Amino acid sequence: MKDNRMDFLKANYHAHTWRCQHACDTEREYIEAAIAMGIEIFGFSDHVPCPYTDGYVSGIRMTMQQAPEYVETIRKLEAEYQDQIKIYVGFEAEYVPEFYEEQMRLFRNLGCDYMIMGQHFLGSEQMGPYTGTETEDESRIRTYVDLVIEGMQTGSYAYLAHPDLMNYQGMDSVYDWEMTRLCKEMKELDIPLEINMLGMGEGARHYPAERFWKIAGEVGNKAILGLDAHCVRHIQDVDSYRKCMDCLLYTSDAADDR
């Protein structure tokens, strides 16, 4: 493979593992690919498990019982590769008020390094709705922004993953108002917004959304690139990296180690 190490991101904090049931390849393979691409910092942030009490079994995240083994696996690899790359372990989490305290206890008990917010649902997973589903319902985009702001005000999340996941296709004025509200609050809290490379690489997805990043640029938000890697191939996607870098032209700042 061509050596693209001089033209690729140096740090990534968004990567998944096979435990989420929609990713493949091993953690070791991810790390080896990251080293080959010249990445200096690599964070695993698999989908956080949820403490369901009604017997619901998620098809898109690990179980609570798998979480200790997940962290232990990454910690062993962190020690093994310490002279070649800095490795972190954490979670990507939705802010769901009824699960928040128990998830934070899990986070602390496992000694995780960080957590990023990826607000895939407007509530618990089994209740939905999925924020990436096209909608003209104003209440959904309003609820999305409200949840993100409330969650970020806890101070528990390092950055906001794919902030433009909300697929509102109603009135432009509503979208602009709500996303401006989100961007202003994230700037006030000094929370970086992620330009998502997985969305860029899979052309059928509606994000990264140019209209969102124009708003973020006008507000002056910090931006960070995230691989959102679900397989080794995503770690090698130089084309999507270059396209995502173009989104930075809209923003006035960028987070460290992008």
Per-region residue spans from a language model:
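Alpha-helix termination/capping residues and helix-transition junctions
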Residues: 36, 109, 154-157
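H/E-rich (His + Asp/Glu) clusters that bind or coordinate divalent metals
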Residues: 199-248
